[in-house]
Amino acid sequence: MKPWKLLDSEDLVDAPWLKVAKEKCELPNGKVIDDFYTLWQPDWVMILARTKDNRWAMTKQYRHGTQAIMLEFPAGIINKGETPEKAAIRELQEECGFCPPGFIPGSVDADEYRCRNEVRHDNFNADGDRIHNDTCVDPIAATTSCSRMTETEKTSITYLGSFSVNPDRHRGRFHVVFIDDVERLGNTHFDDTEDIETVTLSDEEFQAKIADGTFNHPLQIAGYFKWKLTQK
């Protein structure tokens, strides 16, 4: 089996958060498709944040795509230069006010925490595979940074991998980060378009929400079960 050959590409939408292209492709059998449309959005991360009493930190907010209030795990765009873990820490505090254990909002020692706790800068190849880099770089921004407290907290942040958003025509990926024993220590920092309510659910309550259709975000369900498989 061979990949398609890209013959031409025309940008139809070139916005900061969305790109749409019309591509001309040649299939292995020689057939040419003149108008295959692809989408690109920045990679984003979902955060499976579990409190000390084993409850999931979650959000409720209006989503215009579904025109409904949606129950979700915290999530957000990975900014340029950020690792998925770094983006997860930032988004978790911004949306919910929660921090990983031992983190102090506003601390200037974030780089020390991140290096000593082995949350490192990684890259990804074209197939989405993680390329590990042992060098710690890019300190977490001061507004969401925190300092290292104990050696026992070093395993609280776990990168679980990434998925294609839609293998058919979407070029972006979403990443999954699990953070255990989170604490509500900081203030939230919403964008001017956000109105977010924080809720917590036990694992049993959350699974019931999946079963009854209250929680129906397919990508986040995939991320949750990615974590669930690591518990066996």
Where are these regions (language model features)?
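Acidic, metal-coordinating catalytic segment for phosphate/diphosphate chemistry
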Residues: 8-46, 52
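Conserved hydrophobic/aromatic beta-strand scaffold that supports enzyme active sites
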Residues: 20-24, 48, 58, 176-178, ...
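Active-site segment of metal-dependent pyrophosphate-handling enzymes
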Residues: 19, 39-42, 50-53, 63, ...
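Residue-level detector of high-confidence beta-strand sites
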Residues: 9, 35, 59-61, 160-162
